[in-house]
């Protein structure tokens, strides 16, 4: 039984219906045409790969902000946070992470703390690599206060292909760094907003690994001092 549980654990539950559907269609196609069946099974294998849900070695420290998603750090700039969170006209540092269809799409909590507010905003589906995607695209915004008293924002943004955002958080949740909290299907973007003058540890063009890459350190510690926990 444990082996079956481990098997399901490595696939995000959002993928179950897709994988089952692809597999069923593949068997039907294979019964009529071998080549079509092969194409179907390749598509099924890709679907399993897309919804993979690997463990990560999460650096543990109350001062750290880690990447909530796999992808390329496409942009770092000063910008206003999503207006629906009621943070006013004070700019923050925005770190934008672009996920292509080959990245892990499971999202993770960036810091230890408490969820203060959530807001789902329906919108358009521009290419998530465009700057205007942060403003106009469908998004799920989350405001949290870290255990160090810092307010940070992280936003799941739907892209040109992604048409479903899943967020399992609720207001008032106490959360831990690296915990899984949602997923975006298929190809998307995640923005992280941090207070100005935050010490960033990433740069534009860098590859980020969700749950592992340290985006910022409020305490400016050296990496060698961090402890790591598998999640």
UniProtKB/Swiss-Prot annotation:
The modification Pyruvic acid (Ser) is found at residue 188. The keyword Transmembrane does not apply. Pathway: Phospholipid metabolism; phosphatidylethanolamine biosynthesis; phosphatidylethanolamine from CDP-diacylglycerol: step 2/2. GO terms for biological process: phosphatidylethanolamine biosynthetic process. Binds 1 pyruvoyl group covalently per subunit. The active site is at residue 188. Its main location: membrane. Its cofactor is pyruvate. Is synthesized initially as an inactive proenzyme. Formation of the active enzyme involves a self-maturation process in which the active site pyruvoyl group is generated from an internal serine residue via an autocatalytic post-translational modification. Two non-identical subunits are generated from the proenzyme in this reaction, and the pyruvate is formed at the N-terminus of the alpha chain, which is derived from the carboxyl end of the proenzyme. It comes from the Bacteria. The keyword Zinc does not apply. Disulfide bonds: none annotated. Pfam families: PS_Dcarbxylase. Heterodimer of a large membrane-associated beta subunit and a small pyruvoyl-containing alpha subunit. Catalyzes the formation of phosphatidylethanolamine (PtdEtn) from phosphatidylserine (PtdSer). This is Phosphatidylserine decarboxylase proenzyme. It comes from Rickettsia felis (strain ATCC VR-1525 / URRWXCal2) (Rickettsia azadi). The gene is psd.
